[in-house]
Regions:
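Gly/Ala-rich phosphate-binding loop of Rossmann-like dinucleotide-binding domains
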Residues: 20, 24, 186-191
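Short glycine-rich anion-binding loops that position phosphate/pyrophosphate groups of nucleotides
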Residues: 117, 142-144, 261-264, 370
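FAD-site-proximal beta/loop scaffold in flavoenzymes
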Residues: 154-169, 251-327
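Glycine-rich flavin
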Residues: 2-5, 12, 21-28, 33-169, ...
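Catalytic nucleophile loop
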Residues: 16, 179-182
Length: 477
């Protein structure tokens, strides 16, 4: 059966559902097409089940400091792995059901289950149906990267798509790829009592480019499980287990978690028939402010775009793509300040301009280590550091890298400040409550301020104080 609509949306994940809301709001006819599991990557296999596992793991790990706090019996506590995994799935299912109840469950013939592919520009084949659309939104997501040579190891190779389905946990596991997913799941499994070994071909963790922050993260994460960097891994069968070799290191494990990133599902769409211009890697060339692919009437959104694979960005991209797909001319929208958070202990956060992208001759840096921070000491978490980057000429905050407990909250604060183009002086003049982790940020700002071409209203007054009649122009030079 042939069908004609104003907009066809491929993918019922976060980006696709956000695009659909905009198209529906504009009262355009549409279809939402989805192949595979429903329920968004975040709710089903990403953010939410991982955070459920992390919460249990961190609750259990807290027992490590019970003795010095005068709490007895901590050594007797342990995790019942099958019960833990059932708890994670129960929470996951609640969240997925909420997504479905508010989206595809009530859509009728506007929703089509099946895999779409282009047969010509603006014409899609979905099973026996042919769908013609004036405009198309590509939002069909990604899947974990698993080397083809690992297929022979079968179910012993885990990914973030499969690990939460385990009825029980393996006794030992190698985590290959120490980005956000690998670090979060590796530490959580270690805290739950699994013997974990981590590997990454890169010389960093979680994509950190700031050398001081990178070193701090490596030192602190190595307290949770052994980490080996800088070598590719090779897997070999060894009885019923897997031997993992990387450089001079070798370990035998029950399972391997492949956390080497996610690849786009574009290869399922027959993009060669779409009429969309793609780069050498087959990725559509698009404008990130309109999400429009070249001069076509095709838009792209979410993880499939190859940009930051985080929910708030996927939501925004879906909104932008859906808004523009429902209109004759595309509107360019301002994008949010980059924000990346790894929910390990300590948190690893990167905000604003990345260290490697900073103009070195125009930037000053401030640092605060957590050793003397009172609140961090009380929490038993006074290791790590905060690094902030500011433009020398204006004092404007450009970015930061944080390795600290509860830094997820500081990261939001800094992203908002960068979004508002605030200066270090303006930030120093905000209240910092005692005792709080925010005092660590105050320390980093105090460290960078004297290096900037900024001055307060009175040369001999503390920068935190603003005279009642101080003109605004005195805050920067």
């Amino acid at each position: 059966m042939d069908r004609k609509v104003d907009v066809a949306i491929l993918g019922a994940g976060t980006a696709g559902l956000s695009a659909m809301a905009q198209v529906r709001r504009a009262k355009k006819s549409f279809v939402l097409i989805n192949g595979g599991e429903l329920g968004t990557t975040c709710a089903r296999v990403g953010c939410m089940p991982s955070k459920a596992l992390i919460q249990v793991a961190h609750d259990l790990h807290r027992r490590e400091i019970f003795d010095r706090e005068g709490i007895e019996g901590g050594e007797a506590l342990s995790a019942n792995w099958p019960n833990t995994m059932e708890h994670v799935r129960d929470l996951r299912d609640i969240l997925v059901d909420r997504v479905l109840a508010n989206s595809t469950d009530q859509m009728g013939d506007e929703f089509i289950e099946g895999y779409a592919r282009f047969i010509e520009p603006y014409v899609l084949q979905v099973g026996e149906q042919k769908i013609s659309a004036d405009r198309i939104v590509l939002a069909c997501g990604t899947r974990p990267v698993v080397p083809p040579s690992w297929a022979d190891f079968g179910e012993r190779i885990l990914t973030s798509d499969t690990v939460f389905e385990l009825e029980d946990l393996p006794r030992s596991i190698a985590v290959v790829g120490l980005g956000v997913i690998g670090l979060e799941l590796g530490q959580a499994l270690s805290y739950l009592g699994v013997s974990v070994t981590g590997f990454d071909q890169q010389e960093t963790l979680a994509g950190i480019t700031d050398p001081a922050a990178r070193q701090s993260a490596i030192e602190l994460m190595s307290r949770s499980f052994p980490i080996y960097l800088g070598h590719a891994v090779e897997l070999k069968e060894e009885a019923s287990q897997i031997r993992v070799n990387a450089g001079d290191q070798s370990v035998v494990v029950d399972s391997v978690l492949a956390s080497m990133g996610r690849r786009s599902n574009l290869d399922w769409l027959a993009m060669e028939n779409s009429g969309v211009d793609c780069d050498a890697h087959g990725q559509p060339i698009f404008d990130r402010h309109t999400m429009r692919c070249g001069e076509s009437r095709v838009f792209i959104a979410g993880d499939i775009s190859g940009t930051d694979q985080v929910l708030h960005e996927a939501t925004d991209e879906g909104r932008i793509a859906g808004y523009n797909a429902a209109r004759d001319s595309a509107v360019a929208f301002k994008r949010k300040t980059p924000l990346a958070i790894t929910f390990t202990s300590p948190n690893i956060c990167q905000i604003g301009v990345a260290f490697d992208d900073l103009p070195a001759d125009q930037v000053e840096m401030g640092e605060m280590r957590l050793g003397p921070v009172g609140r961090a000491l009380i929490m038993g978490a006074n290791r790590g550091l905060l690094r902030v980057y500011a433009e020398r000429s204006t004092g404007r905050l450009l970015g930061a890298t944080l390795i600290a407990e509860r830094a997820e909250h500081l990261a939001h604060l800094l992203a908002w400040c960068i979004d508002e183009r605030m200066t270090v002086l303006q930030m120093l003049r905000k209240p910092f409550y005692h005792p709080s982790m925010e005092e660590a940020l105050q320390g980093a700002l105090r460290d960078v301020f004297p290096k900037l071409n900024q001055k307060s209203g009175s040369a001999d007054a503390p920068p935190e104080l603003k005279a009642l009649h101080e003109p605004d122009s005195s805050t920067s030079v």
